[in-house]
C-alpha cells in the first residue's frame, strides 16, 4: 500500500484505523477496486470493438454498436478480490508513465498551461473526453473520480502537495464530463501498457512523406487506440461515441496527456533533447510500420492542407514555440518542392506516357503537388479551421484513396478516349466554320482557365442546332480533382506556370487524336462556352500522332483507311450554299423550342453514332462514280471532291427535302459526309453504274463492300480489278441462287436489291401487260437483263428475267384476280336465272375460252381453279339437257348455287349446245366417263330428227356396268311400294334417295345412270315404276341418286304443261316406256310369291288405288297392242312424252318432303292394259335370248310397229339383269358367315321414330337402298310360290307383302344369303359407313306398324 497515490492512502488508512467506520466505506472501496480490476481484464477484448462510423450531422451522439458485456452481480462480487490485487499494480504503472511525461515536458508544463488545458470545454464538446480510467456508475460519489484524475498532476508519487494539482482544474466541467459519461455511455477503456493495439494506431493524419523517418508518421501513445483514417474522418479515441472531425481539425477537448504525448515525436524530429527519444523508441517503430500502410492517406492529406496545419494537428500548435513552427513549415515546403521537381524530371518523353494508366498517375501526382504548394504558400490558421469544420464543401473531404483512384481512373479514361457525353455537350473538337474560313490555328486546350482565343468567325445564320455552351464543371464533382477550381487558395505564379507547362506538354497528346476524328469523318462535336477550338497541328511536329491515331481507330473504330491519303489531315471545307446551315428540323415543325432542341440533339447523336456505316456507303458510291472518270481530268478542271459532288447532287431535288427531315442539309458541313448524302435521283446514278449497284445485292457482296477499300482512285488497274471482283461475286451468287429462282423462291436480299434495281431499269422492261397474263406459263417471256447483266451467262439472264416477270405478275395481278372471282360467280348466278333466250345468247365457245383463260391464270398464280372448274361443270350440265327445260328447272338453279367443293371428275371437253331452231338434235360428239380403273362406257348419240318417222341410232352397249343395273333394279323394286302408298301414309314418309359420297367414280356412276335414260334411250313402265336416277347436289356438297315413280310424275305434271310439250319429246318418252316394260317383264317371271302373304295383301288392298279392272284385261291380243302403240305416237298422246322428259330433267332437283297421291287418267289405263298383255304373253310363251332377239334389239330404234320386237327387247333386258343379279349373289356367297351375326335381329330393329337420332339423311338414304335390295333378293329366292299365287293377287301387292313377310322372317327366307345389303362386289365403288350397323327402312317400318 505504500506505492498507492495519496487519496487511496487516506481512504485505506481511514478505513483501517477507524474501526467504528460505517460499512459503506468498505463497500465503496471494494467496488472501486473491483471496477478497476474488471476493466483491466476486459481491456484486451474491448480493444477490438471500436466505433468508426462517419461523422453524424445531427447534434446528438451516436452510440457505439459494441456494448459492455454485463455479468450477473453475483459473479462480479466473486471476482472482486482478484481485481483488488491487480489494481495496485496498474496504478503503479500509471504513476510511472505520468512521471516520465512530466519530466519530458519540463518548462512547457506550468500551472497556467495546465489550467488552460483542463479548462471549461466548448458548448458542443461537453462529455466528449474521458479519463484514463474506467467510468463510474451513476450512483457513485464525485470524489471517486479523484484517484483517476490525481495522477495526471502528480510528477512524483512522493509529492508533498498532491491535492493542489487535483484541485486546480475547474471542478464543474471536469466532474460534469465524468458523471455524464458514467450515466449515459458504456465504458471505453484503453489498452494497458503491456497490451499494445493489434493494429497500427493512427490517431492523427500523418505529415507528408519525407526522407526523415521520424516525419513519416506520428503515432499516439499506446494507452489509446483508434482505427485508421477512413473517409477523411478523425475519431476521438477517448470515448466510444463517433464524434469525427474533418481533416485539418483537432478536437479542442482532448485530455492534457494526449496533447503532451503527441508533441513528443514532433519535437524530437526537429532536434529536441535525446532523453525523450529513448522513451518513445517503441512508438517510432510502430510509426514506421504504419507509414507504409497509410502512405496514400498521407499524400492525400498533404494535397489538401498546408504542412503547418498538418504539423499542428500532430504536434499541437500550443506546445510548439515560434521557432519550432517555422522549422516545421520550412521542412514541409522543401519537401513539396522536391516532389515537384522530381515529377518534372520524370516527365521525359510523352510518347511513353500515352496509355491512360501513365497519364492517370502523372496527373494525380501533379494535382497533389500543386495542391500541396498552394497550401504551403497560403496557409490557414489552425484555430480558424476548427470552427467551420462541419461546413466545408464535399470535395474538400478526401475519401478512401482506392475509391478516389478508381473514380478518377474512370473519369480520366472517359476523358482520354471520349466522354459519354462527347457527342452532345462535351469538349471541343471542331467548330462550325463559314465558307471563307479554310485554315484554323488554335492553341491547345487549357483546362484551368478560360480561353480567350476564338479563331472561328461566327455568322448570324448559325444553326440553332449549335449546342449551348457548357463549362467543363458539368462533368460532375468527381472531375474537380482534375480540373481544380477551389476558391480557397490561389497558386503562386511559379506553381501556375509549372502547371500550365505540364498541361501544355501533356494535352497536345490528345490534340492529334481529334483532328483525325474530325477531318476523316467530319464529326462536329458541340462546343463549350468560350472554348471553340480546332486542332489542326502539323503531323511533323508530333511524331507520336500516328500511334495515337491507330489507338483511337482501334477503340472508336474509325474507318480512316477508307479516306484518301491526301485528305487525312486536311481541314478544307467544301463550298456549301447558305441553306446548308439551316436547322435539321423544318422551320414550321410544330414543336416547342425546347423540344426542338432535344430532337435535334437526339438526331445529331444518332447520326454521329452511325456515321461509320453511312460513310462506308457513301465511300463505295463515290468510288463507283470515280471509276468512270479520269482523276487527272477532274483535277485539271478543278472538279470538287467526292463529298462535294455527292452533296451537290443531293441538293438537286429540293422538293423532296421539303417533305422529310433534312438530314442531308445538316448545319455541319461535314455532317453530310457522315450521312453519305445518297443522291436523291438514285435512278439516274444507278443508270450510270448499274453493275455496281447490283453488286450490293447479295449479302456476300455487302460484306465485301463493308471492308475498307484500299484502292487509289487514280489507278485504272485497281478499278478494273475491283470491277472484275464484283462481277465474279455476283456471278457466283447468281449461280447458287439460280435453282431457287427457277423454283419460284427468291432470297430476301435479292428481292430487296431487285426492287431497288427496278427503279433504275426502264419501265417497259418490267411492266407486265394485261393481255399477256398466260405468257409466263410458257417461260418464254423474260425481262431484258442483257444490258444490265451483260457479264452473266445467257441462260442465267433468261431465267432471272422470267422470274422477275412471274414475280411482278403475281404481285400486280394477285389482288385483282381475287376480287374478280366472286364477281364472276355472282354473274353466273344471275345468268342461271335468265330465260331460255338469254341463256342461249352467249355461245359455249365463249364460256369455254373464258374458263380456259381463268384456269391458265389460276395455274400461273398457283391457285386452285375452283371458280373456273365450277363454270366448266355448269357448261357441261347445260349441254346434257334440253335448253327448254334448263331455264325453267329449279334444280338447275340449285345446282349452280352448290358449294365449290366439286371434284374434278369430269375432264372431257364440254358439249356445245345445238344452234337455235334445232332443239331436237343432239351432237354426236362421244362422251367418255371414267368409272373405275378400266371400266369405261362410250356411246354415241345419233342425231334425232324432229319428225315422227325419223329413226335414231342409239345402241346401248352390253358392257353396262353392274353398278348401274343394280342401282336401277334396287330403285325399281323399292318404288313398288312407294308409288302406291295411301295418302295418309305418304305424308309422313320421305322420298327414298341413295346418297353417294364425293368419290369421283361414284359421281361418274350417277351421271352414267342419268345418261342411261336420256331422251329417246329408255322408257318407264307403269307396272314397274322405274327410277330416273339423277345427280342431286345436296346443300352439304354431296350427290344423291333420286328415284321417281312414273305414275306419280304423271299425276304431278299439270295438264296444261303436258299439252305444251313438243312431239319429239313424246317419242322419247314412249321409247322409255317400252324399255322399262321389257325389263319389268323379265322380273315378273322371277318374282317370289309367298302364299302366306295373301291375307296381309288383301288387308292392304284397300290402301292402294285399283290397278287392274279385271283379269280379262290382262290378255289382249297382239293386234290390239300394236294399235295402241301406234296410238301412242299420235299428237293426242303428246303429254306422255312431256311427262317423261319432265320427270327426267327434274331428277336433278331436290325432292319435296311430301308426295302427292297419284290420279288415274285415260293414259294410265291404256298403259296398264299394255303391260297386262305383255305379262300374259310372256307367261304363256317365254322367249329365249338368241342372236335373232339381240338383232331385234339393235334394230328396235328404227322399227316400233312389231310387238315381237318389243317383246324381244324386254326379254333381253330382263335376262341381262337376271345374269347380273346371279353374279352378284355368287360373289357374295363367301361372306355369309362374316355378316350372319350382324343381321340376326330384324332389319327394322330400331324404332322408326328414333331414326333421326341415329342416322343422318345420308344414312337413311343408304338404309332404304339396302332394305330394298335385301327384299328383292329374298323375293327371287321363292319363284315357285310366287307362281302359285301369281294369278290371285296383283303384282304390286304380292311384292309389298313379300317384303313385309321378309322383314318378319328374315332368317327363313335366306338363311345362307344374309349378305350385307351395302357390300358391293369388288369392282363396285364402295360406300362408307353402311356396313357397320343395322339398317332400317322407314317405309317398311310404317307398313309393319299398320299391319
Swiss-Prot record:
A biological process from GO: cell differentiation
Region of interest (Disordered), ranges: 55-88, 106-233, 374-397, 628-658, 900-955, 1084-1161, 1313-1335
Principal location: membrane
Keyword tags: Differentiation, Membrane, Spermatogenesis, Transmembrane, Transmembrane helix
Location of the protein in the cell: Membrane
Membrane topology label: Single-pass membrane protein
Skewed-composition ranges (Basic residues): 60-82
Polar residues: compositionally biased ranges: 165-178, 631-651, 927-948
Described purpose of this protein according to its UniProt entry: May play a role in spermatogenesis.
Similarity remark: Belongs to the SPATA31 family.
Name of this chain's protein: Spermatogenesis-associated protein 31A7
The species this protein was found in: Homo sapiens
Gene, per the UniProt record: SPATA31A7
Amino acid at each position: 500500500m505504500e506505492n498507492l497515490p495519496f487519496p487511496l492512502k487516506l481512504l485505506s488508512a481511514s478505513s483501517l484505523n477507524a474501526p467504528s467506520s460505517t460499512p459503506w466505506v468498505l463497500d465503496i472501496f471494494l467496488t472501486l477496486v473491483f471496477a478497476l480490476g474488471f476493466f483491466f481484464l476486459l481491456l484486451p477484448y474491448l480493444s477490438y470493438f471500436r466505433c468508426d462510423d462517419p461523422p453524424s450531422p445531427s447534434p446528438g451522439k451516436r452510440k457505439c454498436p459494441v456494448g459492455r458485456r454485463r455479468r450477473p452481480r453475483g459473479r462480479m462480487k466473486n471476482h472482486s478480490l482478484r481485481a483488488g490485487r491487480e489494481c495496485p499494480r496498474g496504478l503503479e504503472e500509471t504513476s510511472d508513465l505520468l512521471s516520465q511525461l512530466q519530466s519530458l515536458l519540463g518548462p512547457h508544463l506550468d500551472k497556467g498551461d495546465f489550467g488552460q488545458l483542463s479548462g471549461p470545454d466548448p458548448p458542443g464538446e461537453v462529455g466528449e473526453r474521458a479519463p484514463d480510467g474506467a467510468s463510474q456508475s451513476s450512483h457513485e460519489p464525485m470524489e471517486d473520480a479523484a484517484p483517476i484524475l490525481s495522477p495526471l498532476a502528480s510528477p512524483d508519487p512522493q509529492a508533498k502537495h498532491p491535492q493542489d494539482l487535483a484541485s486546480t482544474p475547474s471542478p464543474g466541467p471536469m466532474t460534469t464530463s465524468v458523471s455524464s459519461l458514467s450515466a449515459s455511455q458504456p465504458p471505453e477503456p484503453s489498452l494497458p501498457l503491456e497490451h499494445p493495439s493489434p493494429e497500427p494506431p493512427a490517431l492523427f493524419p500523418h505529415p507528408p512523406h519525407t526522407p526523415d523517418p521520424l516525419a513519416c508518421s506520428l503515432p499516439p501513445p499506446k494507452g489509446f487506440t483508434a482505427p485508421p483514417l477512413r473517409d477523411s474522418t478523425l475519431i476521438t479515441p477517448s470515448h466510444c461515441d463517433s464524434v469525427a472531425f474533418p481533416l485539418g481539425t483537432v478536437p479542442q477537448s482532448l485530455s492534457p496527456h494526449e496533447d503532451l504525448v503527441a508533441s513528443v515525436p514532433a519535437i524530437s524530429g526537429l532536434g529536441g533533447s535525446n532523453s525523450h527519444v529513448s522513451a518513445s523508441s517503441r512508438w517510432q517503430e510502430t510509426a514506421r510500420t504504419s507509414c507504409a500502410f497509410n502512405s496514400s492517406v498521407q499524400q492525400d492529406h498533404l494535397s489538401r492542407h498546408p504542412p503547418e496545419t498538418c504539423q499542428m494537428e500532430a504536434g499541437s500548435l500550443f506546445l510548439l514555440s515560434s521557432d519550432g513552427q517555422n522549422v516545421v513549415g520550412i521542412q514541409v515546403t522543401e519537401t513539396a518542392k522536391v516532389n515537384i521537381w522530381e515529377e518534372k524530371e520524370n516527365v521525359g518523353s510523352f510518347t511513353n506516357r500515352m496509355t491512360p494508366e501513365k497519364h492517370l498517375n502523372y496527373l494525380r501526382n501533379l494535382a497533389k503537388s500543386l495542391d500541396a504548394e498552394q497550401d504551403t504558400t497560403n496557409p490557414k490558421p489552425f484555430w480558424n479551421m476548427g470552427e467551420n469544420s462541419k461546413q466545408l464543401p464535399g470535395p474538400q473531404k478526401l475519401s478512401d484513396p482506392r475509391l478516389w483512384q478508381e473514380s478518377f481512373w474512370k473519369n480520366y479514361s472517359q476523358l482520354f478516349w471520349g466522354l459519354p457525353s462527347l457527342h452532345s455537350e462535351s469538349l471541343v473538337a471542331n467548330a462550325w466554320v463559314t465558307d471563307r474560313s479554310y485554315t484554323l490555328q488554335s492553341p491547345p486546350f487549357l483546362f484551368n482557365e478560360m480561353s480567350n482565343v476564338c479563331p472561328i468567325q461566327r455568322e448570324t445564320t448559325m444553326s440553332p442546332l449549335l449546342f449551348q455552351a457548357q463549362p467543363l464543371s458539368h462533368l460532375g464533382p468527381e472531375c474537380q480533382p482534375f480540373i481544380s477550381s477551389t476558391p480557397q487558395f490561389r497558386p503562386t505564379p511559379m506553381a501556375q506556370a509549372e502547371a500550365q507547362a505540364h498541361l501544355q506538354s501533356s494535352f497536345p497528346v490528345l490534340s492529334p487524336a481529334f483532328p483525325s476524328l474530325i477531318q476523316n469523318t467530319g464529326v462536329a462535336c458541340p462546343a463549350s462556352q468560350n472554348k471553340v477550338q480546332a486542332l489542326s497541328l502539323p503531323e511533323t511536329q508530333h511524331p507520336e500522332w500516328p500511334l495515337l491515331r491507330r489507338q483511337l481507330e482501334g477503340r472508336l473504330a474509325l474507318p480512316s483507311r477508307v479516306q484518301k491519303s491526301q485528305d487525312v489531315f486536311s481541314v478544307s471545307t467544301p463550298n456549301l450554299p447558305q441553306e446548308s446551315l439551316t436547322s435539321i428540323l423544318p422551320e414550321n415543325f410544330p414543336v416547342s423550342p425546347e423540344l426542338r432542341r432535344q430532337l435535334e440533339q437526339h438526331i445529331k447523336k444518332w447520326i454521329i453514332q452511325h456515321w461509320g456505316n453511312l460513310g462506308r456507303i457513301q465511300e463505295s458510291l463515290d468510288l463507283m462514280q470515280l471509276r468512270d472518270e479520269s482523276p487527272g481530268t477532274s483535277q485539271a478542271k478543278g472538279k470538287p471532291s467526292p463529298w462535294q459532288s455527292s452533296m451537290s447532287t443531293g441538293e438537286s431535288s429540293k422538293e423532296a427535302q421539303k417533305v422529310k427531315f433534312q438530314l442531308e442539309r445538316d448545319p455541319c458541313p461535314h455532317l453530310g459526309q457522315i450521312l453519305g448524302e445518297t443522291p436523291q435521283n438514285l435512278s439516274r446514278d444507278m443508270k450510270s453504274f448499274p453493275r455496281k449497284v447490283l453488286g450490293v445485292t447479295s449479302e456476300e457482296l455487302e460484306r465485301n463492300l463493308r471492308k475498307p477499300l484500299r484502292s487509289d482512285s487514280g489507278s485504272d488497274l485497281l478499278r478494273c480489278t475491283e470491277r472484275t471482283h464484283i462481277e465474279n461475286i455476283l456471278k457466283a451468287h447468281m449461280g447458287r441462287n439460280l435453282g431457287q429462282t427457277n423454283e419460284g423462291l427468291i432470297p430476301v436480299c435479292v428481292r430487296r436489291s431487285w426492287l431497288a434495281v427496278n427503279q433504275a431499269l426502264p419501265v417497259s422492261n418490267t411492266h407486265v401487260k394485261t393481255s399477256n397474263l398466260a405468257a409466263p406459263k410458257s417461260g418464254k417471256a423474260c425481262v431484258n437483263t442483257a444490258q444490265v447483266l451483260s457479264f452473266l451467262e445467257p441462260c442465267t439472264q433468261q431465267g432471272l428475267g422470267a422470274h422477275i416477270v412471274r414475280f411482278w405478275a403475281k404481285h400486280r395481278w394477285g389482288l385483282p384476280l381475287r376480287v374478280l372471282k366472286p364477281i364472276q360467280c355472282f354473274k353466273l348466278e344471275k345468268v342461271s336465272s335468265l330465260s331460255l333466250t338469254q341463256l342461249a345468247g352467249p355461245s359455249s365457245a365463249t364460256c369455254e375460252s373464258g374458263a380456259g383463260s381463268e384456269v391458265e391464270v389460276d395455274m400461273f398464280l398457283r391457285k386452285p381453279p375452283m371458280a373456273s372448274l365450277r363454270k366448266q361443270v355448269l357448261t357441261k350440265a347445260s349441254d346434257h339437257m334440253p335448253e327448254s327445260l334448263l331455264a325453267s328447272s329449279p334444280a338447275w338453279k340449285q345446282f349452280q348455287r352448290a358449294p365449290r367443293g366439286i371434284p374434278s371428275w369430269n375432264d372431257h371437253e364440254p358439249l356445245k349446245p345445238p344452234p337455235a331452231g334445232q332443239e331436237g338434235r343432239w351432237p354426236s360428239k362421244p362422251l367418255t366417263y371414267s368409272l373405275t380403273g378400266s371400266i369405261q362406257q362410250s356411246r354415241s348419240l345419233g342425231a334425232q330428227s324432229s319428225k315422227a318417222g325419223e329413226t335414231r341410232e342409239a345402241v346401248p352397249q352390253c358392257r353396262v356396268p353392274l353398278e348401274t343395273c343394280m342401282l336401277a333394279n334396287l330403285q325399281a323394286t323399292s318404288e313398288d311400294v312407294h308409288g302406291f302408298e295411301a295418302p295418309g301414309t305418304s305424308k309422313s314418309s320421305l322420298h327414298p334417295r341413295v346418297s353417294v359420297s364425293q368419290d369421283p367414280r361414284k359421281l361418274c356412276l350417277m351421271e352414267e345412270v342419268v345418261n342411261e335414260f336420256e331422251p329417246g334411250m329408255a322408257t318407264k313402265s307403269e307396272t314397274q315404276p322405274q327410277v330416273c336416277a339423277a345427280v342431286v347436289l345436296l346443300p352439304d356438297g354431296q350427290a344423291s341418286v333420286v328415284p321417281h315413280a312414273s305414275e306419280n310424275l304423271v299425276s304431278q305434271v299439270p295438264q296444261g304443261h303436258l299439252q305444251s310439250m313438243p312431239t319429239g319429246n313424246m317419242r322419247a318418252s314412249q321409247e322409255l316406256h317400252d324399255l322399262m316394260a321389257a325389263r319389268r317383264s323379265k322380273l315378273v317371271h322371277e318374282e317370289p310369291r309367298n302364299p302366306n302373304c295373301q291375307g296381309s295383301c288383301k288387308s292392304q288392298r284397300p290402301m292402294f288405288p285399283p290397278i287392274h279392272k279385271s283379269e280379262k284385261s290382262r290378255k289382249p291380243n297382239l293386234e290390239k297392242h300394236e294399235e295402241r302403240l301406234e296410238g301412242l305416237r299420235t299428237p293426242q298422246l303428246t303429254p306422255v312424252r312431256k311427262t317423261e322428259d319432265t320427270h327426267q330433267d327434274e331428277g336433278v332437283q331436290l325432292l319435296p318432303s311430301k308426295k302427292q297421291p297419284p290420279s288415274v287418267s285415260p293414259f294410265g289405263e291404256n298403259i296398264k292394259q299394255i303391260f297386262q298383255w305383255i305379262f300374259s304373253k310372256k307367261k304363256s310363251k317365254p322367249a329365249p335370248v338368241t342372236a335373232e332377239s339381240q338383232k331385234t334389239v339393235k334394230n328396235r330404234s328404227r322399227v316400233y310397229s312389231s310387238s315381237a320386237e318389243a317383246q324381244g327387247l324386254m326379254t333381253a333386258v330382263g335376262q341381262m339383269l337376271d345374269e347380273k343379279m346371279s353374279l352378284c349373289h355368287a360373289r357374295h356367297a363367301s361372306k355369309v358367315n362374316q355378316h350372319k351375326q350382324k343381321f340376326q335381329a330384324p332389319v327394322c330393329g330400331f324404332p322408326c321414330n328414333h331414326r333421326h337420332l341415329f342416322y343422318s339423311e345420308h344414312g337413311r338414304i343408304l338404309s332404304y337402298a339396302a332394305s330394298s335390295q335385301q327384299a328383292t333378293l329374298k323375293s327371287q329366292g321363292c319363284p315357285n310360290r310366287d307362281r302359285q299365287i301369281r294369278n290371285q293377287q296383283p303384282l304390286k301387292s304380292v311384292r309389298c307383302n313379300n317384303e313385309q313377310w321378309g322383314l318378319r322372317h328374315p332368317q327363313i327366307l335366306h338363311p345362307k344369303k344374309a349378305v350385307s345389303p351395302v357390300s358391293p362386289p369388288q369392282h363396285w365403288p364402295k360406300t362408307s359407313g353402311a356396313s357397320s350397323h343395322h339398317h332400317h327402312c322407314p317405309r317398311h317400318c310404317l307398313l309393319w306398324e299398320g299391319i
